[in-house]
Amino acid sequence: MRTGMAGKEQKSYIAIDLKSFYASVECKERKLDPMTTNLVVADKSRTEKTICLAVSPSLKSYGIPGRARLFEVVQKVKEVNKRRICMAPGKKFAGASVDNEEIKLHPELELDYITAVPRMALYMKCSTEIYNIYLKYVAPEDIHVYSIDEVFMDVTDYLNTYRMTARELAGKIIREIQQETSIAATAGIGTNLYLCKVAMDIVAKHIEPDQNGVRIAELTEISYRKLLWAHQPITDFWRVGPGYAKKLAEVGLFTMGDVARCSLGKPGEYYNEDLLYRLFGVNAELLIDHAWGWEPCTIADVKAYKPENNSMGAGQVLHCPYNFEQTKIVVKEMIDQLALDLVDKRLVTDQIVLTIGYDIKNLEQGTKKNVGEITTDWYGRKLPKHAHGTANLKQHTSSSRLMTQAGVKLYHEIVNPDLLIRRITMAANHVISEKEVQEEQQYEQMNLFTDFGIAKKEKEEKNEKLEREKKMQKAMLDIKKKYGKNAILKGMNLQEDGTAMERNRQIGGHKA
């Protein structure tokens, strides 16, 4: 058994990322090479402002980011072709190609690309096939699925069994993925979860592939400090977003090495860990640990974690700005679906949370609206501040009727009826199982003036009404599961401004 400096067993973790996963699946379906085919996964029927789910590696080589908006792809390809036509014989294109190797060899060809409509069910099927490959080598309790295209594996106890190093095992798994699915992958290996993630995200992207075309990077705490303490931008590191980077830059910290040195400062010095805690609160502890390459959390810890408060919800971006009454239809649909989800999972809630995001068109010149407080979005655009509120229910429930009553009342209380709306987020808080509610002791305040016979009868009638509604909800779920989500609908779903029917054809907000 290998041991670390503190006498503890030294762990071996592998992180695997499927390269441009959605784009690679689309290329595979078309029998095209994912590494040389210019392809984006995006629904162009949603206008060119739609975000691309994936961009193939060859198209990325022209400076297109992985999560570009479609209009950015269109603009960049136009720029490339503007330069190419100057070098084309007779300043004229003889044709077009989506094959990047062909484009490199033939200056007379126009750069072209495929726009593939998202097919989420297909991607989930392929991801499941790849997960089954992981299971050939590692037990499910030692795998953490981070996303549809990324996993972490604790391979500590497998290396002696397979008589392999972590690098050899990672290479074997990746080669099998490529042979079985034609999808390329990269891997990071580390002595903790953070290091394997950073090795994959940063180091593997900048190394040459091995003889099999596979990129695998390894990091230990020491090699991490040598290689990455000076790395910029700091946003390349896991969990360091633009907000963190901005706060750090304002106090003169630009790298993980800077953060690590700051944490060593003595009391009374400007740069010390107190500065980081003032900036980030308790999150500073995690940032300092990561700056040093430390991460105590294991996959077993991740699997065992149970949050103190459970919630579930959904959000959607409307395809065009909706007015107050139009949005109310969608809010009611979302509450109804949330109630069905609770019934399906045998859960109940006692609080609804609603967030409404307004559209930037509310601030267009010539509009005379009381927009209230103005804020700035992620893209630096001015827009009215979102509306947010909670509605407490009198009891834990999954009743669509009770939840809708509370949700619509909340909607009227918090939303500005004069403004156009673009985003809706609906959540159920304090979610617990039906069994937990049944086990809870119920208390009631007694008084001399209540007719408890009438009160008991009213309570029984109320419970009967709720039970009838639940039976109806369960029947609807059975029909939807057997014949499809649109097999049974409510009248409101057939209204022109309803979105439920279209959402039912989607997975994760994208076409199934």
Label for each model-derived stretch:
Residues 354, 426, 484:
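Hydrophobic, well-ordered secondary-structure elements that form the walls
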Residues 1-299, 448, 455-512:
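Gly/Gly-Pro- and Ser/Thr-rich, intrinsically disordered tail segments characteristic of DNA damage-repair
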Residues 6-8, 15, 236, 242-421, ...:
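DNA-contacting surface of Y-family translesion DNA polymerases
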Residues 409, 413-478:
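C-terminal hydrophobic structural anchor segments
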Residues 46, 160, 194, 317, ...:
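Generic "edge-of-domain/loop-turn" microfeature
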Residues 156-158, 191-196, 356-363, 429-435, ...:
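Short, internal active-site loops enriched in acidic
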Residues 152, 392, 425:
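Short aromatic/hydrophobic contact patches that present stacked aromatics
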